Amino acid sequence: MTLTIKEVKQLINAVNTIEELENHECFLDERKGVQNAIARRRKALEKEQALKEKYVEMTYFENEILKEHPNAIICGIDEVGRGPLAGPVVACATILNSNHNYLGLDDSKKVPVTKRLELNEALKNEVTAFAYGIATAEEIDEFNIYKATQIAMQRAIDGLSVQPTHLLIDAMTLDNALPQVSLIKGDARSVSIAAASIMAKVFRDDYMTQLSKDYPEYGFEKNAGYGTKQHLLAIDDIGIMKEHRKSFEPIKSLL
């Protein structure tokens, strides 16, 4: 008895590797609906394989540390919010669980919102430890954004419930005695830093969304404090509020 196309699709969607797909008894079924289902499944499996390969690549720096220090407790650190005109800079320090496997981890700006939220939820529930650090707009104005970012990162480290032995940091160095590796574009090269990037991004976006409830005119829930047209027009119309960075242009020139 010939299987219906719907039944064949169910079988195809249960296949977990391209090799298995190519050897499947339905592979030679010439019906258009079956061939379309095979093509879709192949594409999905190829995407999943690419994510797995990227994930392995992004464990390189962690594995290099573990080769020399098998018991190392590695902490990834990243920040978000260096460029906006309003709101804090937020850092996250994350110690991944030993059996971590968060396919899709990447620079948070490259990860679709739905996937970012999914990863954030999994990370919060499963990692060994994480903590956030914040430097306020006032501190950014007082110290400059680079120093404020360092402050936020150190606060995140200090907030961890587990003491790390090694730090992987996105494009920064810290005045910290722990061994540290600074990686340019680290959020796309290290799973630990990418995890911190995702968590920091979601935390700050939530913060700015809450802030928008008190200051709806600026559109913080959409622009996260960046200088969009709506944001700049609101500054022209009603001025600035306490979370605006007075050392950043064009705000600085308006004072």
From Swiss-Prot:
The reaction(s) annotated as catalysed by this protein in its Swiss-Prot or TrEMBL entry are:
Endonucleolytic cleavage to 5'-phosphomonoester
Q: Reply yes or no: does the keyword Nuclease apply.
A: yes
Residues annotated to bind a divalent metal cation: 78-79, 170
Entry's cofactor comment: Manganese or magnesium. Binds 1 divalent metal ion per monomer in the absence of substrate. May bind a second metal ion after substrate binding.
Q: Which Pfam families match?
A: RNase_HII (PF01351)
Which key words tag this protein in UniProt?
Cytoplasm, Endonuclease, Hydrolase, Manganese, Metal-binding, Nuclease
Q: Which cofactor does it need?
A: Mn(2+); Mg(2+)
Q: Which GO terms describe its molecular function?
A: manganese ion binding; RNA binding; RNA-DNA hybrid ribonuclease activity
Which GO BP terms apply? DNA replication, removal of RNA primer; mismatch repair
The record's subcellular locations are: Cytoplasm
Q: Which GO terms describe its cellular component?
A: cytoplasm; ribonuclease H2 complex
Q: What does this protein do?
A: Endonuclease that specifically degrades the RNA of RNA-DNA hybrids.
Xref: HAMAP family: RNase_HII_B
- Entry similarity comment: Belongs to the RNase HII family.
Write the protein's name.
Answer: Ribonuclease HII
